[in-house]
Regions:
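Short intrinsically disordered, low-complexity segments
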Residues: 8-9, 58, 85, 108
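Generic short N-terminal amphipathic or hydrophobic helices
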Residues: 1-2, 116
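Bacterial Sec-dependent signal peptides at the C-terminal "C-region" and cleavage site
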Residues: 3-14
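Beta-sheet ligand-binding and adhesion/scaffold domains
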Residues: 16-39, 71-122
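N-terminal glycine/threonine-rich, aromatic-flanked beta-hairpin/loop signature
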Residues: 31-70
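N-terminal functional modules and adjacent low-complexity/disordered segments of proteins
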Residues: 2-3, 74
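A short, polar/charged loop/turn motif at coil->beta-strand junctions and beta-hairpin connectors
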Residues: 14-16, 46
Length: 122
């Protein structure tokens, strides 16, 4: 019982886990990319590792875009991980934590900034 309470208390202090909402804006135009209102649901998968389930809002409904596994560097306040689809690498996600806000972007494999991301924890 004490261990369960300790684990629950620790989970509430996790600065990364939870629901994040904001914008994901295209930086490469023209491209198939669209500016989006996004919701990220973030859960721990291992110590300092998280899974981001990414959704975009379409006509008021959440449309699942995919999952991204990221690693958190608490000293730097940074999250990062590879982005891919069907086993094909599509680039890197890099976000910086500042209080209840994550900002950063997604780059293509050649390093070109593809999306600017700015989300706030709900």
């Amino acid at each position: 019982m004490i261990i369960a309470a300790f684990l629950l208390a620790g989970a509430t202090n996790d600065p990364i886990s939870g629901t994040w909402e904001g914008s994901s804006l295209c930086q490469v135009k023209p491209s198939p990319c669209h500016d989006e209102h996004v919701i990220y649901r973030v859960k721990p998968s291992a110590p300092r590792h998280y899974r981001i389930d990414a959704y975009k809002l379409v006509a008021g409904h959440e449309d699942f875009m995919g999952a991204i596994d990221v690693t958190f560097d608490p000293a730097a306040g940074r999250l990062g991980g590879a982005v891919g689809k069907s086993g094909r690498p599509m680039g890197q996600l890099r976000l910086t934590l500042e209080n209840t806000r994550l900002t950063g972007g997604m780059t293509q494999p050649d390093g070109t900034l593809y999306r600017l991301i700015d989300v706030t924890k709900r």
